[in-house]
From Swiss-Prot:
Pfam family, one: GP11
Top-rank lineage group of the source organism: Viruses
Disulphide linkage map: none
Induction summary: Expressed in the late phase of the viral replicative cycle.
Keywords: Viral baseplate protein, Viral release from host cell, Viral tail assembly, Viral tail protein, Virion
InterPro entries: Baseplate_struct_Gp11, Baseplate_struct_Gp11_C, Baseplate_struct_Gp11_N_sf, Gp11_sf, Phage_T4_Gp11_C
Organism: Enterobacteria phage T4
Main location: virion
Name of the protein this chain belongs to: Baseplate wedge protein gp11
Amino acid sequence: MSLLNNKAGVISRLADFLGFRPKTGDIDVMNRQSVGSVTISQLAKGFYEPNIESAINDVHNFSIKDVGTIITNKTGVSPEGVSQTDYWAFSGTVTDDSLPPGSPITVLVFGLPVSATTGMTAIEFVAKVRVALQEAIASFTAINSYKDHPTDGSKLEVTYLDNQKHVLSTYSTYGITISQEIISESKPGYGTWNLLGAQTVTLDNQQTPTVFYHFERTA
């Protein structure tokens, strides 16, 4: 089924069935076709147009090196990715004018459901946020780890599973104000890399030596 045959609605929420606009003149894929072009996998599912699933897979194949690959650079920085770490800060008191004090209520903290009760202080609320974070970690949902702020009981230090950059807006809900402070930025990269060693070389036509760092992908 093509896009023209399916104007009335979306075939599926899967990325195989979501259209993608390829760059005109692009033949980056095997010097033959553009990123996101339809592949046999989508044809076999009945979709005949450029699509997001194909685009994601194309970009993945461009960037990911096999285990055993060696990468050399001059910075000495590992090709591994680094996850972003934030402080989450909480202030206020859990309130809902339609409920009496002590009533159960669910507060969303950056999308994570936190079970609380009306009348809770920010410090008490943080204890419930810890539970929600533990559940997210156990289910491998967005969060890699967390720990308490060393001095401020209304803050938690949170590290994410991915290595994307996340800028989260401050907002208030049910009397609690929730904000983010980035304390360690993410870094692009992937896999596990070991430093094999450094090599100092004076290249042709260069007066000063250059130090090269060799990293091997091990996982």
